[in-house]
């Protein structure tokens, strides 16, 4: 995909409007998890060091659109940036009719969702955003799947629209994993339900050499092979769909599993062959043989795409499957991309962050990209690059 990159532009003296993802958790006026701000800092610093007049904005939470609500203000983010950048960062509440900035100055524009017309991508608001800048920088991959005024409309109307370093890196990594992957490509899809990941599974079944399934999703595939899954979470109405997918793609299904009689973190894990699962059993993880077999498949992969844990890894007795998969990915010489909230939690828990080639910042956007859907913000950047 061809987009203009911010790093290729002359920024000195230019009014630069950065749409970042600063949607961070806040408690008692303090940022409680700074991962998204840290990810955005290099882009902001590049613009400041280049002598640009820098505006950065984001959504935060779900306020009633068009109404100011202090609970969802970006003020805590401004306080964080003041400390992180060691400079005077201002918060602008009323900015739609214009702002005066100096070169090397940073202003945070208040929560875009306080502006009426943001979610519906209204033209009037989009043009007001665009009038603020010479260059629009889209750097929020996590919102790239939404066509809103601050992610799409502004870019269609700004003099120049480009991808920020964070977004450009994301598109490059996902493109490398999906558009032209080194093979074999192994995709790992975990989660509780086939129905919520069906489009992802169908899309990946067409491009993956091996499609590994885990979590509740795997139970539906175990049932599709004719085995009893007891009281496990599975979807009987999607057994035929699972059988169809297994004909289209190599999907290694678990041969042994970790079971218990109740969903309880203190429940003892009982390892069973899939043919031995009883009516009152609940499957919560892969067994050691299945984990070892999948680890070998991952070890031979040249490209790995990972979305979702393969068991109830939050419970110590049922973390072995996800721990084993994590270790295999960490030790793999292949190119690995991981994304999705639970996946990131697993990466943190098993300490493999430094060993994954690329960790996606987008939840819904990551899944939609993997599904093969067009992301509106990316389509906008491609269109503007042609012009």
From Swiss-Prot:
Record flagged with keyword ATP-binding: yes
Subcellular location per the Swiss-Prot or TrEMBL entry: Cytoplasm
GO MF annotation, one: ATP binding
Record GO biological process: gluconeogenesis; glycolytic process
This protein's record includes keyword Flavoprotein: no
Positions with a binding annotation for ATP: 197, 314, 340-343
Signal peptide: none
Binding residue positions for substrate: 21-23, 36, 59-62, 113, 146
A cellular component annotation (GO) from this entry: cytosol
Pfam families in alphabetical order: PGK (PF00162)
Catalytic activity: (2R)-3-phosphoglycerate + ATP = (2R)-3-phospho-glyceroyl phosphate + ADP
PROSITE patterns, per database record: PGLYCERATE_KINASE
Keywords linked to the UniProt accession: ATP-binding, Cytoplasm, Glycolysis, Kinase, Nucleotide-binding, Transferase
Pathway the protein acts in: Carbohydrate degradation; glycolysis; pyruvate from D-glyceraldehyde 3-phosphate: step 2/5
EC number: 2.7.2.3
Summary of subunit composition and partner proteins: Monomer.
PANTHER family from the UniProt entry: PHOSPHOGLYCERATE KINASE, PHOSPHOGLYCERATE KINASE 1, CHLOROPLASTIC-RELATED
Family under the similarity heading: Belongs to the phosphoglycerate kinase family.
Protein's recorded name: Phosphoglycerate kinase
């Amino acid at each position: 995909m061809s987009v203009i990159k911010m790093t290729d532009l002359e920024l000195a003296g230019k009014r630069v409007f950065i749409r970042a993802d600063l949607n961070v958790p806040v408690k008692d006026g303090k940022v409680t998890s700074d991962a998204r701000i840290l990810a955005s800092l290099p882009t902001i610093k590049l613009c400041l060091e280049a002598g640009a007049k820098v505006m950065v904005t984001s959504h935060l939470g779900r306020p009633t659109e068009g109404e100011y609500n202090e609970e969802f203000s970006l003020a805590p983010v401004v306080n964080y940036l003041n400390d992180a950048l060691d400079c005077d960062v201002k918060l602008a509440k009323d900015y739609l009719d214009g702002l005066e900035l100096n070169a090397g100055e940073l202003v945070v524009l208040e929560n875009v969702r306080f502006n009426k017309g943001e979610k519906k991508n209204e033209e009037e608001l989009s043009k007001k955003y665009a009038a603020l800048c010479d260059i629009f920088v889209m750097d929020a991959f996590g919102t790239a799947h939404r066509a809103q005024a601050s992610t799409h409309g502004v870019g269609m109307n700004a003099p120049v629209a480009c991808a920020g370093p964070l977004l450009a890196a994301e598109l490059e990594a996902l493109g490398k994993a999906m558009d032209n992957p080194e093979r074999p490509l192994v995709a790992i899809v975990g989660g509780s339900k086939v129905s919520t990941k069906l489009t992802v599974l169908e899309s990946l079944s067409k491009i993956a050499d091996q499609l590994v399934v885990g979590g509740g999703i795997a139970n539906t595939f175990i049932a599709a092979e004719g085995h009893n899954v007891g009281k496990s979470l599975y979807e009987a109405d999607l057994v035929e769909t699972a059988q169809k997918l297994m004909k289209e793609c190599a999907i290694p299904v678990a041969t042994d599993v970790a079971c218990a009689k109740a969903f309880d973190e203190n429940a003892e894990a009982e390892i069973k062959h899939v043919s031995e699962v009883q009516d009152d059993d609940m499957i919560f993880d892969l067994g050691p043989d299945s984990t070892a077999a999948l680890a070998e498949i991952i070890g031979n992969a040249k490209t790995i795409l990972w979305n979702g844990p393969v068991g109830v890894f939050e419970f110590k007795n049922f973390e072995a499957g996800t721990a084993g998969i994590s270790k295999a990915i960490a030790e793999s010489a292949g190119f690995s991309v991981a994304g999705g909230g639970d996946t990131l939690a697993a990466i943190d828990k098993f300490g493999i962050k430094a060993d994954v080639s690329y960790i996606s910042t987008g939840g819904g956007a990551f899944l939609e990209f993997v599904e093969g859907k067009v992301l509106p913000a990316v389509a906008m950047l491609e269109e503007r690059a042609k012009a």
